[in-house]
UniProtKB/Swiss-Prot annotation:
Source organism of this protein record: Arabidopsis thaliana
Something else known: Pol IV and V functions are not impaired in nrpb9a mutants and Pol II functions are complemented by NRPB9B.
GO molecular-function terms, A-Z: DNA-directed RNA polymerase activity; nucleic acid binding; zinc ion binding
Positions annotated to bind Zn(2+) 2: C76, C79, C103, C108
Loss of function: phenotype: No visible phenotype; due to the redundancy with NRPB9B. No effect on methylation at RdDM target sites. Nrpb9a and nrpb9b double mutants are embryo lethal.
ZnF locations on chain (TFIIS-type): 72-113
Keyword list, A-Z: DNA-directed RNA polymerase, Metal-binding, Nucleus, Transcription, Zinc, Zinc-finger
GO annotations of cellular component type: nucleolus; RNA polymerase II, core complex; RNA polymerase V complex
The protein's role, per its UniProt record: DNA-dependent RNA polymerase catalyzes the transcription of DNA into RNA using the four ribonucleoside triphosphates as substrates. Component of RNA polymerase II which synthesizes mRNA precursors and many functional non-coding RNAs. Pol II is the central component of the basal RNA polymerase II transcription machinery. It is composed of mobile elements that move relative to each other.
Stored SUPFAM superfamilies: Zinc beta-ribbon
Gene Ontology biological process terms from the UniProt entry: DNA-templated transcription
Protein name as catalogued: DNA-directed RNA polymerases II, IV and V subunit 9A
Binding site for Zn(2+) 1: C7, C10, C29, C32
Subunit structure, as described in the record: Component of the RNA polymerase II, IV and V complexes. Interacts with NRPD1.
Length: 114
């Protein structure tokens, strides 16, 4: 998918346009009325990449989520607090689900997995 398409007739930018009768995507020139059928139905793709610090913030916020299950059967290795929320998710580069724990001590937020 190229980022921009240009008119073959006048070299102006082609804009996405729907042909409602044929239900196809076209690229149309607003200057000379040239139109061409789009070779791909994807007009724009927005990829969001989160930094490590953003992912860490998401994990520390889960300790205050009232919808997540809590347990007092674990002890935080960092602060010795006896309450943690837990959830299952896939760990990066691993297959299957991993059980994650996040310490409920607001001054700690330590996270670990089993």
């Amino acid at each position: 998918m190229s980022t921009m398409k240009f008119c073959r007739e006048c070299n102006n930018i082609l804009y996405p346009k729907e042909d409602k009768e044929q239900k196809i995507l076209l690229y149309a020139c607003r200057n000379c009325d040239h139109q061409e059928v789009a070779d791909n139905s994807c007009v724009y793709r927005n990829e969001v990449h989160h930094s490590v610090s953003e992912r860490t913030q998401i994990l520390t916020d889960v300790a205050s989520d009232p919808t997540l299950p809590r347990t007092k059967a674990v002890r935080c290795s960092k602060c010795q607090h006896r309450e943690a929320v837990f959830f299952q998710a896939t760990a990066r580069g691993e297959e299957g689900m991993t059980l994650f724990f996040v310490c409920c001590n607001p001054n700690c937020g330590h996270r670990w997995r089993e």
